Each structure stands twice: as C-alpha cells, then as structure tokens.
C-alpha cells in the first residue's frame, strides 16, 4: 500500500499534544508514533492484515500521481501483485489559514479516495503516466504546457478531461492555458468540493475512473498543477 498526503494527521496530532500539555504524565513514547506521517498507512495495513510493502509519500497536491507511479514500479518488479494507493486529508484551522496565504478565495475541504492498481486484462486501464514536470527550471505554466504535450491525449469527443482548477483565475492559469483549446467534456471537481490538498487529485482520479467504468467515456485525462513541486497527469481508458 502507498499513502500520499500533504498535511498528515493534524487533528490527531493536535489532540495528542493538547492532552500532553494538559497532563505531562500522558507523554508516553508508545503513543507518539500515532502522530507521524506514516501512521495512517500503517494502520490500514494492519486493519487489512497486509504484510506487503508499505510506504508514505509526502508531496504537494500532485503526490497521488507519484503514488501511482511507485505502485506501477512495484508491480512491474514483481514486488507485489497489486497495490492500493490512498490519499486522505483532514482540515483544521491552521491548514485553512495556510491556504489563505495563497488566496482568500480558497474553499478548504477534506476527504479520502483510493485506487487499486494491478496487472490485469480487465477493468479500467492506466494507459499513460508520463514523468511529472518539475518547477525547478520552468514556470508553472510552462511545466503544465510541456506536460500536456508529453501526454498527447486526443480530443476526440470520447475523452473526458478532469482538471485541477479550483475557480481562482490566478491559481488556475497553468491548466487554463495548457488546455485552452480542449473542446471535449471537462470536469473541475475542486470548484464544487473545494481544495482538499493531497486528496484532491485522488478524488479527481476516482471521478474519472467511475466515468470510464460506467461507459460515459472511453478515456479520461486527470491533470493537476501542484503548489510548489511539479505538474503531473495521466490517461486512463477502457481501450
């Protein structure tokens, strides 16, 4: 299993440290691991009885793509038969305030979503997952434009575009410009459910997967431009 996130267990950590400050006798080292980034992944593996590889990736909002890429690598190497890629975020006042530094118009959100990736001949297929494009040597707009060219998705009326736009023009500019000529169906889930940070791309991916699985579209593009690291996307489809 691979768990991807931005914030981590903020509410649990706040509760833990609040109790410790109120009563230092509660400061047991046995409890401390519950507050670290890898705690959710470890708990889920224990819940499902998995002794397989388990990892947590901390990234910007595009981390779910990195999780899928690592899962595909594990499967190709024969380390695992299948991999559950999960992302979850919970919101508190501190993370909501942090979003406000980017824009006062952000709508903070939370949630969780997961995709199970395996080598099989049935189900929705991961057709393309190009390497992400870093912001280290180019702007966010340039990175997103280059990424679209690498994906080379066909605007044929049978392909859905599920983008990462949130309804704030300045934040949305990279994807707005990179996909300005897209004439097919286009969904922007964050405009409806808000900014769930690490979980947003996972929610986009599930929306895209369900649209293909239900036969609404033959293929779907999922794309996102991260806050400070990279732009990433993928193409999935039934054929």
What residue spans do the PLM features occupy?
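Internal active-site segments that recognize and position negatively charged phosphoryl groups
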Residues: 70
């Amino acid at each position: 299993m691979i768990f991807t996130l931005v914030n981590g267990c903020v509410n649990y950590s706040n509760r833990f440290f609040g109790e410790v400050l109120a009563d230092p006798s509660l400061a047991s080292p046995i409890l401390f691991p519950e507050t670290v980034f890898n705690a959710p992944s470890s708990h889920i593996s224990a819940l499902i009885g998995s002794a397989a590889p388990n990892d947590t990736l901390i990234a910007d909002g595009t981390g779910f793509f990195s999780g899928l890429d690592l899962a595909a690598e594990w499967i190709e190497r024969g380390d695992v038969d299948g991999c559950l890629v999960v992302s979850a975020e919970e919101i508190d006042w501190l993370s909501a305030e942090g979003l406000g530094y980017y824009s006062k118009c952000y709508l903070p959100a939370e949630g969780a979503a997961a995709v199970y990736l395996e080598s099989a001949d049935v189900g929705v297929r991961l057709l393309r997952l190009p390497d992400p494009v870093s912001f280290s040597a180019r702007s966010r707009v340039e990175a997103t434009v280059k990424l679209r060219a690498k994906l080379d998705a066909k605007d044929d009326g049978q392909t859905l575009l599920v983008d990462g736009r949130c309804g704030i023009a300045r934040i949305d500019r990279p994807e707005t410009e990179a996909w300005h000529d897209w004439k097919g169906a286009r969904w922007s889930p964050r405009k409806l459910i808000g900014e769930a940070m690490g979980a947003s791309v996972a929610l986009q991916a599930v929306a895209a997967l369900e649209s293909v699985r239900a036969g609404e579209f033959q293929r779907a593009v999922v794309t996102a431009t991260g806050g400070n690291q990279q732009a990433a996307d993928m193409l999935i489809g039934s054929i």
